[in-house]
């Protein structure tokens, strides 16, 4: 179970996220929505450790993560898809994913392996990386340098690297942004498949409400940094507070 308890952050006198408390259970996909400037990405940054909270806390599986940095939270089971800033651009797509798989599996094998064990492990890492690339339709790009990828394939690689981490929690911030009509369905299909694993928790920031209503089991609405609605998609989207805050529908005069 992922939880945030009264999670807040202030920038000077501005409260960007205001005491947001939420619990996200395994086997669910929660979409976090709201107008521009609502605090969605800032909230994501607080959860993943990219920003330090001014107050409140983050918990995963009963363990407090608030004082941990982003890398430590990743090791604890939080996985977030990021722009390609921490890769080896001169290496191939396959090599980058294989390194991510290897890093994830460090410590799972006994030390002092013989040469045959080392070779077998290398082969296993390669097969796992190839399987991940196939799942995001990137197998044809396996030998290409990361720096040569077009935008749509970069987004696919972000998801591939997230899968290599084998996290308990998958965090997607607008995963299809900038992708064309042929590319976006690949990522959405992958998220649907991830959703079938009832041991995983998925958080999704997404502006496309047709995608949200199709994929989400639950919608959390932020407005001016505060949680203003939380529930099943049909109920939340029909509520007056969401019509006003998120959709910008003005109140009718009495």
Residue ranges of predicted features:
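Glycine-rich phosphate-binding loops of nucleotide-dependent enzymes
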Residues: 1-254
């Amino acid at each position: 179970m992922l939880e945030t308890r009264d999670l807040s952050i202030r920038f000077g006198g501005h409260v960007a996220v205001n005491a947001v408390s939420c619990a996200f259970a395994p086997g669910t996909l929660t979409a976090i929505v709201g107008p521009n400037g609502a605090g969605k990405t800032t909230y994501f940054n607080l959860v993943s450790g990219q920003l330090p909270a001014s107050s409140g806390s983050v918990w995963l599986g009963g363990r407090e993560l608030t004082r941990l940095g982003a890398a430590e939270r990743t090791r604890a089971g939080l996985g977030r898809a990021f722009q390609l800033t921490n890769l080896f651009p001169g290496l191939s797509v396959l090599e980058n994913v294989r390194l991510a798989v290897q890093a994830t599996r460090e410590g799972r094998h006994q030390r002092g392996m013989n040469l045959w064990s080392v070779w077998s492990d290398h082969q296993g890492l390669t097969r796992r990386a190839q399987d991940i690339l196939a799942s995001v339709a990137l197998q044809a790009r396996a030998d290409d340098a990361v720096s040569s990828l077009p935008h749509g394939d970069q987004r696919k690689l972000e998801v591939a690297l997230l899968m290599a981490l084998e996290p308990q929690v998958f965090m997607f911030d607008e995963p299809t942004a900038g992708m064309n009509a042929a590319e976006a369905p690949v990522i959405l299909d992958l998220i649907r498949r991830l959703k079938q694993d009832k041991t995983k928790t998925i958080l999704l920031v997404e502006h496309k409400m047709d995608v949200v209503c199709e994929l989400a089991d639950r919608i959390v609405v932020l407005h001016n940094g505060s949680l203003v609605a939380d529930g099943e998609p049909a109920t939340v989207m029909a509520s007056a507070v969401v019509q006003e805050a998120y959709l910008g529908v003005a109140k009718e005069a009495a």
